[in-house]
From Swiss-Prot:
Protein name: RNA 3'-terminal phosphate cyclase
CDD domains: RNA_Cyclase_Class_II
Record field: catalytic activity: a 3'-end 3'-phospho-ribonucleotide-RNA + ATP = a 3'-end 2',3'-cyclophospho-ribonucleotide-RNA + AMP + diphosphate
Species, as recorded: Aeropyrum pernix (strain ATCC 700893 / DSM 11879 / JCM 9820 / NBRC 100138 / K1)
Keywords on record: ATP-binding, Cytoplasm, Ligase, Nucleotide-binding
EC number: 6.5.1.4
Lineage: Archaea, Thermoproteota, Thermoprotei, Desulfurococcales, Desulfurococcaceae
Biological-process GO terms, alphabetical: RNA processing
Gene Ontology terms for molecular function: ATP binding; RNA-3'-phosphate cyclase activity
Length: 361
């Protein structure tokens, strides 16, 4: 399929969610391939584009100089004709508490192919339901991308929680690599350290401390390791956040990978449960022997499909998201192939990914 030929993606494939839309539009921008998506979120209620999806699509279009048709709330089809990915400074508002992390997922692949340094400021939710937390993106996602030769900086200026939002995050790519290295994630290597970051904003700092104690206690019990703990809390008169919220990230740094687990608080949910959930997520994934946790098992294949060469991954869980994205990559990226070597849906898995070696256009 030539770069000028339209690729048609059925948005109802697999789980049929917003991740198909975000990933397809990002890939179209990288590949310079016009894209038509039909049946957008057909399995969701209500179907069609929601405001947070529009932000991702419009951000990709702005940075790649692309044209959009059908980019409106409720639309079940969309056409995107990309231009060239340009560096510079951009600013996007995700809405009251739309996930900043999901916008970063959409933008990160194409920022690597920018023709010059690029900086993007995002306003919205940093720690919201149904998405990785911003700390996960900073400590795990960015670390894994660095192992693929891609340095992406994620700086949090202010957190934003549901429903108020108002978080501010700056994403910088000072030296776009123009592609990615193939790399296998099968062996973890020696454990170098475990870390806990617990935050509470517009709330007593004792909540952040209770979350951290709960997470750290479980890590000590299961791993026999004392984690390094960081508490983020604010005095009431110096707290810049718009609304209350809490969250925890627990992450483990190994010689060959980084893995993490996160959780966010909500009204009525004890702080101890928040901390325990984050630690349990990491510890469950570590117990499988995998080198990529459940979140990165979803996200890493996009970069490995664009990389030059063969990568083998051992992921903690082949989620429905990951399975759908692998099929989308096969449709959109000429030359990409994959094989599931072991495991299956919702189980630990090993996969071989043969990347297409995509270079800047």
């Amino acid at each position: 399929m030539g770069s000028g030929e339209w690729v048609v993606v059925d948005g109802s494939m697999g789980e049929g969610g917003g991740q198909i839309l975000r990933t397809a539009v990002a890939l179209a921008a990288v590949l310079g391939r016009p894209l038509r998506i039909v049946n957008i979120r057909a399995k969701r209620r209500p179907p069609g584009l929601r405001p947070q999806h529009l932000t991702a699509v419009r951000a990709v279009a702005a940075i790649s100089g692309g044209r959009l048709r059908g980019a409106e709330v409720g639309s079940t089809s969309l056409e995107f004709t990309p231009g060239r990915v340009r560096g510079g400074r951009y600013r996007f508002d995700v809405g009251t508490a739309g996930s900043v992390a999901l916008i970063i997922q959409a933008l990160a692949p194409l920022l690597a192919y920018s023709d010059s340094p690029v900086e993007v400021e995002l306003t919205g939710g940093t720690d919201v339901p149904m998405a990785p937390t911003i700390d996960y993106m900073r400590e795990v996602f960015a670390s894994i991308l660095a192992m693929l030769g891609y340095e992406i900086e994620i700086r949090v200026l202010r957190r934003g929680h549901y429903p108020r939002g108002g978080g501010r995050v700056v994403v910088r790519v000072p030296d776009p690599p123009g592609g990615f290295r193939a790399r296998s994630f099968v062996e973890r290597g020696p454990l170098k350290g475990v870390y806990v970051r617990s935050h509470a904003v517009k709330l007593p700092g004792s909540i952040a401390e209770r979350q951290a104690r709960s997470a750290a206690s479980l890590v000590r019990e299961r791993l026999g390791v004392d984690p390094i703990v960081e508490i983020e809390a604010y005095k009431p008169h110096r707290d810049p956040h718009l609304g209350p919220g809490t969250g925890v990230l627990v992450w483990a740094v190994f010689g060959e990978t980084v893995m993490g687990g996160d959780s966010i608080g909500k009204k009525g949910k004890p702080a101890e449960v928040v901390g325990r959930e984050a630690a349990e997520s990491l510890l469950e994934d570590m117990a499988t022997g995998a080198a990529l946790d459940r979140h990165m098992s979803d996200m890493a294949p996009v970069y490995l499909a664009l990389a030059g060469g063969v990568s083998t991954v051992f992921g903690a869980r082949l989620t429905g998201h990951a399975s759908t994205i692998l099929e989308l990559l096969r449709i959109m990226v000429d030359g990409f192939e994959y094989r599931i070597l072991e495991g299956g849906l919702e189980r630990p898995f090993k996969a071989e990914l043969r990347g297409a070696g995509v270079s800047p256009r």
